[in-house]
């Protein structure tokens, strides 16, 4: 996995910057009930999306949390007084404290299924009855846009995805949440060129091909042989799922 303290300085510019953040925030807010008054953004990173969540819904109190100190510092500069340094597996908040909890581009990073379930359970715990949990799913699959780069990388070693739609739904339902909608948004500025794919490979972006892996040079050579080395291929499209916490005694609560 990438070192997100080292990654913080170049995180935004390497991942589509403000256009991608705007698309992500719009997607999340489209699943947030109009009556919501508080939102917790788990794994807020540099706060580039979190800030737009706050700006995009007047009256919504937004709090960010991230476990990487460097990321949290960037986020705190964007949202003074509203960012907490903490691990998503052990959120330092009371039960039922937030009307909405979001986790954008988080669950795909978690290698241990036990930890994935713990994160979803924590998000459910701090969610108020009637509240909504919004999270990205199938992040890795979203980057497969059918390009020539994807053809080259199709045979690379893979680990099982930790954020498949079915898995995340099973974790959410296991915590007492119920499905409440979905949305898609474009990953603007994230269409890879072959040259960019090689750079990502060299710095460990593909976790099963870390720098120094015996196969890394072979994949780099195959990417270097592709035409139009600097032409970005199509942007990915990311998927959001929403889950609601039933109000006790309501129809949805059974």
Outline where the language-model segments fall:
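Class I SAM-dependent methyltransferase SAM/SAH-binding core
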Residues: 38-42, 46-90
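Short alpha-helix
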Residues: 160-176
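Conserved Class I S-adenosyl-L-methionine
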Residues: 178-254
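Short catalytic micro-motifs in class I SAM-dependent methyltransferases
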Residues: 105-109
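Conserved class I S-adenosyl-L-methionine
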Residues: 1-36, 48-52, 71-74, 132-162, ...
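A short glycine-rich, Lys/Arg-flanked "PGG" loop and its adjoining helix->strand segment in the class I
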Residues: 117-129
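A conserved beta-strand element that flanks and buttresses the S-adenosyl-L-methionine
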Residues: 102
